[in-house]
Amino acid sequence: GRVHDINSYDALSSDFMNDDLSDYLDDQFAGEYLDQYTLRTPKDRMPLYHLVGALDPLTDADVTDRPNDRLPVTLGEWINADGLTHLKIKLSGDNFDWDVDRVVAIEKLAAGAQAARGCSEWFYSLDFNEKCENVEYVLAFLKKVQEQSPAAYDRTQYIEQPTSRDLKAHPEIKLHEAAKLKPVVVDEALVDYEALLLARDQGYTGIALKACKGHSESLCLGAAAQKFGMFLCVQDLTCPGFSFLHSASLAARIPTVTAIEGNGRQYCPDPNRPYARAMPSMFDITDGTVGTSCLDDIGLGFG
């Protein structure tokens, strides 16, 4: 993009690319280029997914050490400070009762915090970090959550990598039944196009893209997911500063990505400060969204 003094996402057509997508994926993509699967202008704003870690306190009763860093500590404080509407909940995958209780507790806390600020719509994603032994665990978990908190179940947008990343070693694990209930997203197992196809065969209905795993690979796999009608999300692995802007630019240019993960501000906020001065809409969160329209400069859109 910088070579041609244009945004890199505008350099993905046959005018700039020597080979079509079939060279990187397969013959299903003959005659297609990445410009067909990306936007010419970034989305204006995107909801921000806030991480709720397994050890993160929900209320003051959970706080054992309150750092003197002027940041929110409890989930309720974060919701109030940033106007959060999207929460990514980390679960154990091997402690059934704890997993169910955690989601139910978060829904109870969030419902109070959101009601206090007049918000009626918010969402969850659930990340088991590949700890579930089988699909039966996922199915039983979803059933129990739906029984104990129908609202929490309804707010859940997708489930992320519930079982082992080693798809070839566990062909017996099929996630089709779980995917009938909620999109099931492949994350750690997504290493290339072959892995995407295998994950799809095993019941995954969505993929998670990470800019830090490779920009070109993310674009190609994002194109494949769109062609196959799969759910798409972009995650950032606690990337701060420049790396968060890169992740956001990817999310803002892929049409079917509806939210962006951004937890660097929670755990390592200092690297964000120089960039916040130049792009406040990306780092000063007040309504649960980031203003991605600013990512329209040459190159990747920033800096």
Where are these regions (language model features)?
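N-terminal capping/lid subdomain adjacent to the active-site entrance of alpha/beta enzymes
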Residues: 1-131, 135-147, 301-303
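General beta-strand structural signal in soluble alpha/beta enzymes
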Residues: 10, 50, 126, 186, ...
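A generic structural signal for short, non-catalytic loop/turn and secondary-structure boundary residues
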Residues: 39-45, 152, 177-179, 253-255, ...
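Residues that form or immediately flank small-molecule/cofactor binding pockets and catalytic motifs
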Residues: 53, 189, 264-265
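Short, surface-exposed amphipathic charged segments that create phosphate/polyanion-binding patches used
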Residues: 64, 140-141, 201, 222-223, ...
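Catalytic core of soluble alpha/beta enzymes
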Residues: 80, 86-238, 243-244
